[in-house]
Amino acid sequence: MSEVVTQTKPYDILVTGASGFIGKKLLNKLTDSGFTVTAMSRSKYPDTENVKRVQADAFDVDSLTQATAGIETAFYLLHSMEGSKKEWAEFAHREKQQAENFLKAATDSGVKRIIYLGGLVNEGLELSKHMRSRHDVGKILASGTIPVTELRASVIVGAEGGSYAMLRYLVERLPFMVCPKWVKSQTQPIAVENVVDYLVGAMKNSETAGKILEIGGPDTMTYEQLMRLYSSILNRNLMIIQIPFLTPRLSSYWIDLVTPVKASLARPLVDSLVHDSVVKDKTGQKMIPVQLEHMTQAI
């Protein structure tokens, strides 16, 4: 019988990246569920009901130590996907440094659990730089003495999310698309609300500590099928021409050219689609029951 975790003292739950796509929704879910939360971001925001805001820089251990003081459970949602071309070129090093800094600060502050949202790919072939970095971050966080729950998610779909923005702009703006072979990769897209359900569920179930859990939605489809589904909802015809030699790097520049999604953000999104990302291990679904949304609802 798993132990249901409850909050032991006010504001002892930390959400890092609290101003981001996932972080904002996680904050709302936690507070709606009756928890009081400490929200960490690079910029300072005013406190709100049941949310205490703290400002910290993931490259400054001292600020992280202050942010994690008194924290029992920390949600790790930090990444280095956006930024300048120079920052993109160094993203793996930056993500490694962030994770090492956070682990040191969390250890010094006596944090009891870390819950990390990573990416799901079916390993076998060589991972892209982006997905390798996401897995490496999980290993760094788990290398200490704090139990880590790593949730590896397939493509996350929801308003404000990078994958959704790329999908929406491509389908809405272009009558036809020239696409590389990665549009045929199998994915198990998951609604952002369900990702948040899994994050909160992992926190509540103590038996998830120390485990890597794969999460995805109820539908398995290619990214091309996902684009066609969205176009059908808009009642639009979508013509796709596949070009096998179009590399992820060239794809990201093309997306930058035809949509508002910057190449620095498009590149990791495309990289995450190069590999199949389908749930093979159902342990996460068994340990954290979630009512999953079909893509027709999530889009």
Regions found by a protein language model. Name each.
Residues 2-12, 198-265, 276-299:
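Mid/C-terminal beta-alpha module of Rossmann-like enzyme folds, strongest
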Residues 2-35:
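N-terminal Rossmann NAD(P)H-binding glycine-rich loop of SDR-like oxidoreductase domains
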Residues 133, 162-163, 182-204, 211-214:
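Substrate-positioning beta->alpha
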Residues 118, 139-160, 166-169, 173, ...:
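Conserved beta-loop-beta element that borders a ligand/cofactor-binding pocket
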Residues 16, 40, 77, 114-119, ...:
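SDR active-site strand-loop-helix element
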